[in-house]
């Protein structure tokens, strides 16, 4: 959202897709490496979720920028698209619904990741047995990275898009 506001729509979308691809390819590379490994300490899907968590943390707190990065939503979105592209349908609908009502991107993002977490209780995940825990972790991280947005909304100073 910051790139969109500062640089305009074209550059903002470029940054958004770049961040989403970062999350997607982090899991893609992890999956490729794990598939070639004979001895594993964890279940293969756990490596994907650990890759998700670390790509999210690396995006939010990059060493190269004095640990000041983005809020991680697009990176997490890309990772969840890798896990299952259909898995983001309801969160996307939740995002659109909340955004159209309030015009707050931060609130819509928080809502989308809450929907993502809630839907893990209703969808069969096959090999992704820890999806509940990791989607909760990502939701809590999204809440943490959006805490300034939450404070601004409560104060009435959040900028609508």
What residue spans do the PLM features occupy?
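Cytosolic, membrane-interface loops and tails of multi-pass inner-membrane proteins
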Residues: 1-11, 69, 151-161
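Interfacial segments of multi-pass membrane proteins
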Residues: 2-8, 30-34, 54, 72-102, ...
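Nucleotide and nucleotide-moiety/phosphate-recognizing core
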Residues: 11-17, 21-63, 86, 95, ...
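Membrane-embedded alpha-helical segments of multi-pass transporters/permeases
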Residues: 27-28, 64, 100, 117, ...
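Membrane-helix interface "capping/anchor" motifs
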Residues: 62-68, 97-111
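Loop-to-transmembrane alpha-helix initiation sites
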Residues: 89, 105-112, 127-136
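C-terminal membrane-associated helical module and adjoining short loops/tails
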Residues: 129-161
